[in-house]
């Protein structure tokens, strides 16, 4: 009974959800229809705000904005990647290490003074990192990759006065964003093929190191070959479609919903700064 129930429990364990990058979640919503430049401006503004005002109020209000945007965009819970166990262990070790630093506030437990300052600082940095990661994930989940490069070219148009090659940078960004998912898939296939290869355990430690070195060299050579092949195919496709200028020539301008989004973000940011500066520090 016990020997058969254990495999059953292991067999019904849910598989871990992988990290999906640069692939939008299917659907139609107000967040999906926003101009890509608006999303980039919101991410940039919130990042600057959290850099200069990394308080709990600011983090909480920005987290509320991200959660509201995810709810409006109908982002399913399955889109969230599974947190690996080793990351929880690293966070626990970091929390314990930071808690040893002490600091204010101090809590008395059974006559022992415990400083919670280090632990609170660690939790605040962790929460800030989660908010920034969620912002980037929202852009990835609701934005087509082809819309990012034209938005960067449009936003960087004022810098052309300084002779900054904005269009060339936008084209390079478009190529990188389009090549990244393909290369990730190719590397996963190469890694899976390497794991399926039959292995013989060398008798000595030196032989094992030599085998690992040979496998690493073979994997790097295959990765370079795949990268060059994909680059050649992408170059042919770009040439057939009219050159690199078409990559940053996607029409797109802010609409009413974009201005409303920027206004809501500015109001929330201003409210958070006012609470942090005037009320909590008065």
From Swiss-Prot:
Looking at the UniProt entry, the stretches that span the membrane are 18-38, 40-60, 87-107, 119-139, 164-184, 260-280
Q: What is its main location?
A: membrane
Q: Where in the cell is it found?
A: Cell membrane
Query: What cellular component terms from Gene Ontology apply here?
Result: plasma membrane
Matching InterPro entries, A to Z? ABC/ECF_trnsptr_transmembrane (IPR003339)
Task: Identify the keywords attached in UniProt to this record, alphabetized.
Answer: Cell membrane, Membrane, Transmembrane, Transmembrane helix
**Family recorded in the similarity comment:** Belongs to the CbiQ family.
Q: What name appears for this protein in its UniProt entry?
A: Uncharacterized protein Mb2352c
The organism's lineage? Answer: Bacteria, Bacillati, Actinomycetota, Actinomycetes, Mycobacteriales
């Amino acid at each position: 009974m016990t020997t058969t129930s254990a495999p059953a429990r292991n067999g019904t364990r849910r598989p871990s959800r992988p990290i999906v990058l640069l692939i939008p979640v299917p659907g139609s919503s107000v967040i999906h229809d926003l101009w890509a430049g608006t999303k980039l401006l919101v991410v940039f503004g919130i990042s600057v705000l959290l850099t200069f005002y990394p308080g709990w109020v600011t983090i909480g209000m920005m987290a509320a904005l991200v959660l509201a945007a995810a709810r409006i965009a109908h982002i399913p819970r399955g889109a969230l990647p599974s947190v690996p166990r080793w990351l929880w262990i690293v966070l626990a070790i970091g929390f314990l290490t930071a808690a040893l630093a002490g600091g204010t506030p101090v809590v008395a437990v059974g006559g022992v003074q415990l400083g919670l300052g280090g632990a609170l600082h660690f939790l605040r940095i962790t929460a800030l990192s989660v908010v920034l990661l969620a912002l980037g994930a929202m852009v990835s989940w609701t934005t087509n990759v082809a819309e990012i490069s034209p938005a960067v070219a449009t936003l960087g148009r004022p810098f052309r006065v300084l002779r900054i090659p904005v269009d060339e940078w936008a084209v390079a960004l478009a190529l990188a964003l389009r090549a990244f998912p393909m290369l990730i898939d190719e590397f996963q296939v190469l890694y899976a093929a390497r794991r399926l290869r039959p292995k013989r355990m060398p008798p000595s430690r030196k032989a094992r190191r030599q085998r690992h070195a040979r496998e690493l060299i073979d994997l790097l050579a295959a990765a370079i070959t795949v990268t060059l092949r994909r680059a050649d195919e992408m170059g042919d496709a770009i040439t057939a479609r009219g050159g690199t200028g078409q990559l940053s020539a996607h029409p797109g301008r802010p609409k009413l919903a974009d201005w409303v989004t920027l206004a809501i973000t500015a109001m929330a940011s201003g409210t958070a700064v006012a609470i942090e500066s005037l009320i909590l520090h008065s």
